[in-house]
């Protein structure tokens, strides 16, 4: 079932009008308190209008968009190369700009689709695109100027002078250059142009065609519809029939301005700039955490329904109370209950799906060499979750758990993810284990896979493990740690943690030496009060304790991938990561070189080596690292699940990890692909028969899980931005240090150093100059009699990539945050002057 066909979330409208004087929630569906004030109205039942699916408007029937060509024509065009197939990406800051990967590969810039050529397609849709004539392509000004200087300025026959050099208008098509400067289409190389395409057919509607937004009156009172304006600018405005809307909206629309509704697009005709749609329901007051969270969940179609009785009844066990591991399981499972097994997780985690143990052994290689046994124990979810059951279908559709700032929307019922499957301390739990025998230098000699029984001794938080690592000589007491079961001591837990830490460091170094890459982008962490409102915000810091767990999860995933690929070469579910887009990573490298930070992105190893140069702990190093990480992440392609059926071995490669086989095995509580991998590994080991699912079915699951994983990530990111916005609205304007990421003629993008948040700063109301070729923006500050002494006169300041500036974060609208550049102080200007010499010597544009 494709995303757009899914019936899961889009439901028949409920109440579509604000009701009562005051609605107060002490904790809404997503846990945040909300108070909504409205004017009194009487509730009325929803009545479906007879003409709801045949909206007519009074617009000129002239076609605004071109009609789609037939599927047969599309298939033929893709086959003969006159068209190509791609996934549409719409610029969230400018819905008139859309992008697709170039059909000739990643060494070419993206194909650009502009304005009406988008032809009613939406974000994420799989579309057929026809390349427009070369004369309609846009000029890539920077590359074009280089070509002009080399090939036209010295051409005596051209008769051109400096006054005839190319126009600097950013969006200028080749046709203009042909007319104005006498060039021909054939002589201008494609590398100087941006390929322009037009969408001719939608092959798959990946976008759900749903949105959250607000209602507006139509400017034409004779029009029988209401305008729905989505919060996501990439979604078109939607015509809603008047019969869907509370009658009182038309007499007092101002009272409805702050309310958020949800709507579903039913059609988008070629003769209308607006889509047709239906109102689904009233969400609540915009700006309230619970309302905005429901908006996020709805827009990304995250299934947050309570699990049905049929789902729960499909479990072999319906209650967790007094549950014990059946005796029959001990007959074939390896028993690790005598080993000191424990978990390391976030402090608030309740779904504990992985545990570790480590111990010294006398023979790690069969030759009497002392070494280590490391056990990675993963919750045996498939013991409870049987293939083909109602719950299995639900889990497959959800694809994964979704983590929001204040809550988790689980993939599985809480009886599994928090009780029966969670590797809680002090109780016997079923697990699926990978056990490694290795030397103290992390040379791997043997891997054992199998079902097992464990008994975790303690639930450590990352903070506890980090305390052990930072204070190895300290004698920890029981009061400093969570409860430890089975008579083990804090000393024993500490020693096992340090043993794991030492070997994890070696494993990590080996991976980095072999070319593994890690790009760490800042992640926000919020301190919440009892009402789930933000009281503080910081960047989540990845420490050695996090890296400890990560290393052993990676190792287990890699070894399991090899095992299932070997046993099921046509059915294995693996995860690959394509290399970055060649042209984009080359452009990023050139950008970084211009600002004095060499970067080599030809391989993951070379890129990793480049990034490790900026791993220092100073404020300057952190700024550089954040900027370069933000730049290098853009050319990266998404890692994806796939079925190995008829795939070449080269397709298996994981660029970031630089390994040939990788999968996800270690989180079956929160990722459905891990469930499939558990079943495949169990079949490879002879525990059960191989699944009857054919490769095409497995690939369909992979595709769906790729989609749900992306939707969950985007929802999680939006939730973080929601909470950040609420925090700024609570605290008021905030002055922050920021680093410039990119410069345009009317604005520039900055990375807020303290929070890792990217904001756009507009300077369109200031006097300014912009040099496109050097990407340098000069701002002219007017005289200010209220400024500090010595800083009152008019002066200019330059904005280039990697400059450090100060901005004010200001509450904007209901929950949004805008950034405004701060007038540089006299001290900052003096520092700037004193660093100019150093900048010239090093080629760096960092301003401290």
Curated annotation (Swiss-Prot):
One Gene Ontology molecular-function label: RNA binding
Membrane spanning residue stretches: none
Description of the deletion phenotype: RNAi-mediated knockdown in a ced-3 and ain-1 double mutant background reduces the percentage of animals with developmental defects including production of ectopic seam cells.
Enzyme class (EC, first level): hydrolase
Positions marked as site (Important for catalytic activity): 353
GO cellular component terms, A-Z: P-body
E.C. number: 3.1.13.-
Chain residues that bind Mg(2+): 345, 354
PTM comment, free text: Cleaved by caspase ced-3 in vitro.
One GO term of the biological process aspect: miRNA catabolic process
Compartment(s) of residence: Cytoplasm; Cytoplasm, P-body
Keywords (A to Z) from UniProt: Cytoplasm, Exonuclease, Hydrolase, Magnesium, Manganese, Metal-binding, Nuclease, RNA-binding
Cofactor(s) named in the record: Mg(2+); Mn(2+)
Stretches for region Disordered: 153-173
Reported function: 3'-5'-exoribonuclease that specifically recognizes RNAs polyuridylated at their 3' end and mediates their degradation. Component of an exosome-independent RNA degradation pathway that mediates degradation of cytoplasmic mRNAs that have been deadenylated and subsequently uridylated at their 3'.
Family statement: Belongs to the RNR ribonuclease family. DIS3L2 subfamily.
Name the UniProt record assigns to this protein: DIS3-like exonuclease 2
Species assigned in the record: Caenorhabditis elegans
């Amino acid at each position: 079932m494709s995303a757009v066909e899914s019936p899961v979330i889009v439901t028949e409208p409920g109440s579509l009008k604000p009701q009562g004087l005051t609605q107060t929630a002490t904790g809404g569906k997503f846990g945040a308190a909300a108070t909504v004030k409205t004017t009194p109205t009487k509730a009325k039942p929803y009545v479906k209008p007879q003409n709801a699916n045949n909206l007519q408007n009074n617009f000129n029937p002239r076609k605004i968009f071109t009609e789609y060509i037939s599927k047969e024509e599309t298939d033929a065009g893709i086959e003969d190369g006159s068209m190509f197939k791609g996934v549409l990406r719409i610029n969230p800051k400018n819905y008139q700009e859309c992008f697709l990967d170039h059909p000739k590969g990643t060494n070419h810039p993206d194909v650009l689709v502009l304005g009406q050529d988008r032809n009613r397609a939406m974000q994420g849709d799989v579309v057929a695109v026809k390349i427009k004539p070369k004369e309609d392509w846009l000029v890539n000004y920077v590359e074009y100027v280089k070509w002009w200087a080399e090939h036209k300025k010295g051409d005596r026959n051209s008769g051109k002078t400096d006054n005839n050099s190319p126009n600097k208008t950013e969006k200028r098509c080749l046709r203009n250059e042909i007319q104005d400067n006498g060039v021909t289409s054939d002589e201008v190389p494609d590398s100087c142009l941006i390929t322009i395409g037009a969408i001719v057919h939608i092959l798959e509607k990946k976008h759900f065609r749903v949105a959250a937004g607000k209602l507006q009156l139509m400017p034409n009172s004779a029009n029988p519809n209401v305008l729905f304006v989505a919060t996501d600018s990439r979604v078109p405005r939607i015509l809603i029939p008047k019969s869907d809307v509370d009658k009182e909206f038309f007499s007092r629309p101002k009272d409805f301005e702050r309310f958020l509704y949800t709507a579903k697009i039913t059609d988008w005709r070629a003769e209308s700039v607006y889509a047709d749609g239906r109102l689904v329901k009233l969400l609540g007051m915009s700006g309230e955490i619970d309302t905005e969270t429901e908006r996020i969940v709805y827009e990304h179609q995250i299934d947050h329904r309570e699990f049905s009785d049929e789902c729960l009844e499909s479990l072999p066990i319906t209650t967790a109370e007094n549950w014990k591991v059946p005796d029959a399981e001990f007959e074939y499972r390896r028993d690790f209950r005598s080993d000191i097994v424990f978990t390391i997780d976030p402090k608030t985690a309740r779904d504990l799906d992985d545990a570790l143990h480590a111990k010294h052994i006398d023979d790690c290689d069969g030759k009497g060499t002392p070494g280590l046994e490391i056990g990675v124990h993963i919750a045996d979810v498939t013991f409870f979750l049987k293939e083909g059951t109602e719950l299995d279908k639900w889990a497959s559709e959800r694809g994964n758990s979704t983590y929001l700032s204040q809550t988790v929307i689980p993939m599985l019922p809480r009886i599994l993810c928090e009780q029966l499957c969670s590797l809680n301390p002090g109780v016997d739990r079923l697990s699926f284990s990978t056990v490694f025998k290795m030397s103290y230098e992390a040379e791997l000699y043997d891997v054992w896979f199998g079902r097992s029984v464990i008994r975790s001794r303690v639930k450590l938080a990352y903070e506890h493990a980090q305390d052990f690592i930072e204070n190895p000589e300290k004698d920890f007491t029981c009061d400093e740690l969570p409860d430890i079961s089975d008579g083990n001591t804090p000393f024993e837990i500490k020693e096992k943690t340090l043993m794991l830490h030492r070997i994890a460091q070696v494993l990590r170094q080996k991976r980095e030496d072999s070319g593994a890459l890690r790009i760490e982008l800042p992640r926000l962490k919020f301190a919440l009060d009892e009402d789930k409102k933000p009281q503080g915000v910081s960047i989540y810091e990845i420490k050695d304790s996090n890296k400890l767990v990560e290393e052993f999860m990676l190792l287990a995933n890699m070894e399991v991938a090899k095992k299932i690929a070997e046993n099921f070469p046509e059915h294995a579910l693996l995860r690959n990561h394509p290399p970055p887009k060649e042209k984009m990573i080359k452009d990023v490298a050139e950008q970084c070189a211009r600002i004095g930070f060499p970067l080599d992105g030809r391989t993951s190893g070379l890129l990793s080596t480049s990034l490790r140069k900026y791993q220092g702990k100073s404020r300057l190093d952190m700024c550089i690292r954040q900027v370069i990480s933000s730049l290098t992440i853009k050319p990266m392609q998404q890692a994806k699940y796939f079925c190995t059926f008829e795939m070449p071995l080269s397709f298996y490669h994981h660029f970031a990890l630089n390994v040939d086989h990788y999968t996800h095995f270690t989180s079956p509580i929160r990722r459905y692909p891990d469930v499939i991998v558990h079943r495949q590994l169990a079949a490879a080991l002879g525990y059960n028969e191989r699944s009857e699912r054919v490769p095409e079915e497995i690939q369909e699951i992979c595709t769906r899980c790729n989609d749900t994983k992306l939707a969950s990530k985007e929802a999680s990111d939006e939730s973080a931005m929601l909470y950040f916005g609420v925090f700024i609205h609570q605290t008021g304007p905030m002055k922050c240090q920021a680093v410039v990421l990119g410069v345009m003629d009317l604005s520039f993008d900055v990375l807020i150093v303290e929070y890792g948040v990217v904001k756009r700063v507009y300077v369109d109301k200031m006097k300014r100059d912009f040099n496109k070729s050097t990407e340098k923006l000069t701002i002219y500050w007017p005289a200010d009699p209220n400024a500090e002494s010595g800083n009152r006169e008019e002066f200019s300041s330059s904005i280039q990539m990697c400059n450090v500036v100060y901005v004010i974060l200001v509450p904007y609208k209901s929950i949004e945050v805008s950034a405004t550049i701060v007038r540089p102080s006299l001290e900052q200007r003096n520092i700037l002057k004193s660093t100019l010499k150093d900048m010239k010597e090093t080629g760096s544009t960092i301003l401290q």
